[in-house]
């Protein structure tokens, strides 16, 4: 501990679990020293809103799956992905593990701004570290029981896609390995992947559950071969589908398409399934907003829920028809705030009021976007919290994880900027009276 760091709950965090407490060469460690309090009713609302939005998003995903391919292409979905977006998966849901992100408006109401449906991180913070902080301060943890809930969720997945099946002809139980994979030189990805893997191992202690780096991953005509000559029955991949689909072998062969062909043939299950890319696409929020505005597809209650929680979202082609005001422009495949701009629209002209610059931009892996979408700009309240270097002001990004269609752990990040990026801190949440 250096002279600028005082003793806090951060010292109680297990560095073998939360391996990125100190990240890169940032002056401050990643967690804040202080916690943020909301009443239980606030967390209940976050979870209820997330569950309702999840049902609506799944309903809208069916619209996109049943639409002509030209519509998907207009939303900048990769052409190579189109054959794989209508394959039924084990749980008949477009995403199994997802995370809704919210901001607060000036009245303190939650407004949903994004969903990470493909490769959500922030798992270690929400399902582990938040509880350590709450216990340290003697406060109620809004995520009490969430770790067990996540373990049971993973156990259910294992039972469905990787439980041993007897080979009656041989009288054996052939291995059905469930493989967890990421690029293991990125600490956050590795820690989140291993956290999920270890919870599945707890829930299915007799299962064949193992880690394999994406750097070591191979495929052949039968699927994903492993070092003991077995084949993966299922794969958890912390690697964006929109990037995977474009990857090629050293010989120039379409590795992503070859990989998904094997999935389509039933060689292995995928978590999350390929159709998670539909919800991950940022213009999907514009589709949901447009369907709700038409009042012809969703029920009246669903339309009301979209109006209440989803920040008004628009396709790029509709921007010229919008009224004057401030909007946020987001690239379809942007991540970590990359290339996000605040634009001021007046009559038929618009100017850039602010452009997000993120730290370590070269390390943020994302697909180049050919299109963008817009959202209403939400002015946010500012709060004060303490970090290693002192007291700072900032805004909150609030998250709620979904395990299938069930809301689970909540979490918060704290950023000096209204548009959070890689500079954001982990801020533990506690429950007030």
Predicted segment positions?
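Preference for protein termini
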Residues: 1-433
